[in-house]
Amino acid sequence: FFYLARICNHCSYPACLAACPRNAIYKRPEDGIVLIDQERCRGYRKCMEACPYKKTYYRGTTRTSEKCIACYPRIEGKDQAGGGLPMQTRCMSSCIGHIRLQGLIELNKDGTWKEARNNPLYYLIHIARVALPLYPQFGTEPNGYYIPPRWVSRPYLEQMFGPGVDAAIEKYSAPDRELLAVLQLFGKDQRICHRYEIKEAPKVFETEVRGKKFVMHNDTIIGYAKDGTKII
């Protein structure tokens, strides 16, 4: 048993959108957030049936469906606390365990991610490959990623996160210099970190983890907002 926080994945190919007979669900092109138009929704609840993650809900008082809106005013930089900079959602920034990280990426015309080597999300998902999608077999291409826990049954984790589980846990159990630094960005600031850089320092510790060499350095990681402002 382990606790798994499940939120709307704002999928690249949302099943809720395809199922809505009223065309009330749409995906914003500027940031990929999936929203329900409350004026068009008539509460048929087809979105609830279609979503494999069960993240749309029916509100009896309004007789319409609702879902996570990804705190889009904060993403747009309209929260005064952010000084005009894009901010992480409330669920991300309020996590007392500092285990959540949100980011924004750009897409190529074919829908693939543009290379952004020093973007924290790009690194965790496409370089280190320790962050995996939940139930990728559903085919919706979810945009919520998880670093799988180490002490849970592997067959169970493979069912949840796909075939990359073993490699992710192996990498995460004894993180290399860059991965260890990037993991320090989690929960450090409410503003979205678009880019990081690492200032290297001398080695301070060395040991062996599960038969693999692990070295820790006294490095400093610096995070920058979209406009280049130093935020971490």
Model regions and ranges:
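A structured beta-alpha segment of the ubiquitous adenosine-cofactor-binding alpha/beta core
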Residues: 1-5, 9, 17
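Iron-sulfur cluster-binding cysteine motifs and their immediate structural context
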Residues: 13-40, 46-65, 70, 77-109, ...
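General N-terminal targeting signals
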Residues: 42, 52-53, 73, 117-119, ...
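Long, compositionally biased charged/polar accessory segments in the mid-to-C-terminal portions
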Residues: 80-81, 92-232
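Structured loops at beta-to-helix junctions and adjacent beta-edge loops in soluble globular domains
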Residues: 11, 71, 147-149
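N-terminal start-of-chain detector that recognizes signal peptides
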Residues: 7-9, 39-43, 115-118
